[in-house]
Amino acid sequence: MRDDGYLFTRDDFVQMLARKWYPERTDRESGVIRDYLAAHHVEFDSFTFSKRVGRGIEPNPEHLEGVQRNTVFSSRKRIDILAGSGAHPTLIEVKERVTPASLGQILTYRSLFIEENPDADEPSLVVIGRDSDPDTL
């Protein structure tokens, strides 16, 4: 897995829609993604799944070098989908059930994304899921 995620472009959309699962997603979350892509893929030029942002935790210097790299990689925050439409980014968080925690999570990702990409457009934020409750929506 590359540090910058799994990139799919407009040329990959047909293949992407036919997938049973998506990188680093559960079967249920993959179903949510598939339904969203079927309805919205024409709005975007690209999708990057599992885009890592943030610094991660400091690794133990006594561990093997590979373990240290994995510690940093695994502890960085993961934007489920970074979608692009020209230069405009959209951060997409995928949940089976959308909760207030999901909304806070995407705000954290926005902050980290802006910190790492200060020249980027202000990202649109989207949280997708199968269901939620009236207080969250």
Predicted regions mapped to residue ranges:
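Charged, terminal alpha-helix-loop-beta segments
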Residues: 1-137
